[in-house]
């Protein structure tokens, strides 16, 4: 079991937390799986509203310009022909969804890899609680500075512990995103430089991820 320090919002150690080796060991990092998860996530974000005008949609008359035979010229149907300038586009992009099915086991494996990578890089921080006295952005900005999270930061709180003070105080922080423990995605962990979990959030996330690890893998790590 790996131990991680639990801090308060002032940056002082107030305890420690044991993390499961089958989730947070450096050997659990699978870069290929992380790439697949990020590719799927970014594909699902695409609007897919691109469209080109084909022969049916482009403006222009559909009348045949000249008779089929006898003129010596090449046969032609209308000015909307794809062969002509300002004609329709052939096989151009049309509106579609770029989303595709991604196995849940792969997603959970990628999440374990992202967490292990963050811990190995020393960029994963656990705090006892995000609670402050009032919903002030300044209070959270000061807390992040003391936690040495001056750049982009991902805040992860459990759904049961989310408070109005945290929601209102963190929403106006630049380069900071707040998510719940059941919403965190590998892409979020890779996108932000530091990830700060509350104790409740990391415990619940660890509990749910342990259910996705095979017994064989648990035995190998043990």
Curated annotation (Swiss-Prot):
It holds the Pfam family Ribosomal_L4. One of its GO terms (cellular component) is ribosome. Keywords: Ribonucleoprotein, Ribosomal protein, RNA-binding, rRNA-binding. Gene3D superfamilies: 3.40.1370.10. InterPro entries: Ribosomal_uL4 (IPR002136), Ribosomal_uL4-like (IPR013005), Ribosomal_uL4_dom_sf (IPR023574). The keyword Iron-sulfur does not apply. Signal peptide: none annotated. One of its GO terms (biological process) is translation. GO terms for molecular function: rRNA binding; structural constituent of ribosome. The keyword NAD does not apply. One of the primary rRNA binding proteins, this protein initially binds near the 5'-end of the 23S rRNA. It is important during the early stages of 50S assembly. It makes multiple contacts with different domains of the 23S rRNA in the assembled 50S subunit and ribosome. Forms part of the polypeptide exit tunnel. Part of the 50S ribosomal subunit. Belongs to the universal ribosomal protein uL4 family. NCBIfam families: rplD_bact. This is Large ribosomal subunit protein uL4.
